[in-house]
Amino acid sequence: MELCDNLAVGGTTPSYGVIKAAVGLAKDYQAKVIVMIRPRGGDFVYSQQELAIMLEDIKCARELGVDGFALGALTSENQLDTEALKTLLDASRDLEVTMHMAFDQIPKAAQPSAIHWLKENGVTRLLTRAGTPETALDSRLKRYAELVQLADDQLDILAGGGISVANRDQFLAIAGLEQVHGTRVVF
């Protein structure tokens, strides 16, 4: 389960109290809690002050017993901010890390090298919509298959964005795509 607040802006870090309650509830169901680490909506280019806030949020959530984090950071050129990400990954060590949909802002031509970096630096999974909100479903499905190949069993690809009960099986039919993400996906 990914836990976040403010879905209207793409998700932000939930409060300490919400994280604590979710971790307690999840234990009853043997469910994992992955907490969004994002100090605000908008772009994914963070100041040093925002990175400090993100590090403090990771520390607090870790102390509450979460299983991992969903996070991301980009440069103003929409490339991975590897310096910021290394800092966040170090703070997240030994827990699962999902690169969230900030990835979708990276130009398609640069995505293979970004995936390589994520694999080399211990990221667990990549959450992506495999296109824009306007991208046709067939094109997204094709792109997911390409991303699964690029991940080469070293990074889980997590399909997200517009997935619902009505279409989830089309995504899960892609070889190597075993997870879907959404607010309207119920099994």
Role assignments for model-derived ranges:
Residues V35-I37, L71, M99, A159:
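Structural beta-sheet core signal
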Residues L7-I34, Q48-A52, A73-R93, I106-S113, ...:
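Active-site-adjacent beta->alpha loops and helix N-cap segments on the catalytic face
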Residues K32-V33, I37-F44:
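Glycine-rich nucleotide/cofactor/substrate-binding loop typically near the N-terminus or early
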Residues G42-C60, V97, D104-N121, K142-A159, ...:
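Catalytic cores of alpha/beta
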Residues M1-G11, C60-N78, N121-A136, I163-S164, ...:
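Glycine-rich phosphate-binding active-site loops on the catalytic face of alpha/beta enzymes
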Residues A31, V66, L95, V123, ...:
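Short glycine/serine/threonine/alanine-rich loop segments
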Residues A22, A61, L88, H100, ...:
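Conserved, mostly hydrophobic/aromatic
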Residues R38-R40, L74, A102:
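Beta-hairpin (beta-strand-turn-beta-strand) motif
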